[in-house]
């Protein structure tokens, strides 16, 4: 059985048997987690989202502070964001391990953000990273393709350590070979995976103009038996459509109200100007 109608679940070969999913890396972890949450809820699954490191607050999400009331929120919304709060950093942080275990027992799928990168698109983990719960079924590594062609100093979280790992200088650019190594090396994003299933999601494929680069990455990872999925989590801008009704005989008004001036500007022109500002 599989989620055949769901783009990201299908692309990452996520199956209903994958109940505890950890997401590591950089360049789109949180966005991927929320996209997977959306697809899982649409598939009728009860979902809990949490972190073992730090995660941005999401005020519009159903939130269970310290995991309290999580089950009721899942029943009401289909999913819940459950975490403790680091008030100094104004971020969400890890639940106590007992609470994390408890959370995993009240949902069909637990999605865990198990790494941090401060919004940088490229990352190599340090000794203490990532923080993957031991009961995890599958690990998804995320990296941003927009880092290709950028210098390590520009694109990497902890550029000095990243350059050391890659055998480069901080001023050197990140290449497709660097990306392949980052997601396939046991000291890279494969770190801590062990015998769990492993997937790679490479985000922002729209920033790569040469299709051959994507083909090369896919081919080399395939040779290592590492499934990779390319995509883009950027939200498309929604255009606002506006209709202005500008007709009528103006009998009660006594004159053509469309041409009636307010502060020297015809009413229709003033209204149109306001609508165009709203559309911006």
PLM regions with names:
Residues 2, 90-98, 106, 115-223, ...:
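Conserved catalytic-core segment of NTP-binding enzymes
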Residues 4-41, 240-243:
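Walker A (P-loop) phosphate-binding motif
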Residues 23, 48-51, 81-84, 110-114, ...:
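General beta-strand structural signal in soluble alpha/beta enzymes
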Residues 25, 52, 84-86, 203-206, ...:
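Structural motif
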Residues 37-90:
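N-terminal phosphate/diphosphate-binding loop that engages ATP/GTP or pyrophosphate donors
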Residues 42-47, 105-109, 218-231:
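Structural alpha-beta junctions
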Residues 77-80, 105-110, 138:
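Loop/turn-to-beta-strand initiation segments
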Residues 239-280:
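N-terminal glycine-rich phosphate-binding loop and ensuing alpha1 helix
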């Amino acid at each position: 059985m599989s989620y055949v109608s769901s783009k990201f679940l299908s692309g990452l070969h996520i199956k209903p048997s994958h109940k505890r999913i950890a997401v590591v890396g950089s360049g789109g972890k949180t966005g991927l987690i929320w996209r997977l949450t959306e697809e899982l809820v649409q598939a009728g699954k009860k979902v809990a989202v949490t972190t073992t490191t730090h995660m941005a607050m999401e005020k519009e999400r159903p939130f269970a502070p310290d995991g309290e009331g999580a089950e009721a929120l899942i029943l009401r919304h289909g999913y819940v964001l459950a975490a403790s709060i680091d008030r100094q950093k104004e971020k969400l942080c890890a639940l106590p391990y007992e609470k994390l275990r408890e959370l995993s027992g009240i949902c069909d799928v637990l999605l865990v953000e198990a790494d941090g990168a401060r919004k940088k698109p490229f990352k190599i983990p340090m000794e203490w990273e990532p923080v993957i719960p031991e009961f995890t079924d599958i690990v998804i590594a995320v990296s941003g393709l927009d880092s290709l062609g950028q210098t390590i100093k520009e694109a990497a979280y902890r550029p000095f350590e990243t350059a050391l790992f890659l055998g480069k200088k901080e001023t050197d650019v990140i290449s497709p070979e660097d990306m392949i190594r980052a997601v396939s090396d046991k000291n890279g994003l494969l770190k801590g995976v062990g015998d769990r299933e492993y997937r790679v999601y490479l985000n922002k494929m729209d920033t790569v103009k040469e299709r051959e680069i994507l083909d090369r990455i896919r081919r080399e990872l395939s040779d290592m038996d590492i499934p990779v999925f390319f995509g883009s989590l950027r939200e498309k801008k929604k255009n606002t459509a506006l209709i202005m009704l500008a007709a009528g005989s103006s009998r009660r008004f006594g004159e053509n109200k469309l041409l009636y001036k307010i502060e020297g500007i015809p009413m229709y022109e003033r209204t149109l100007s306001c609508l165009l500002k709203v559309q911006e």
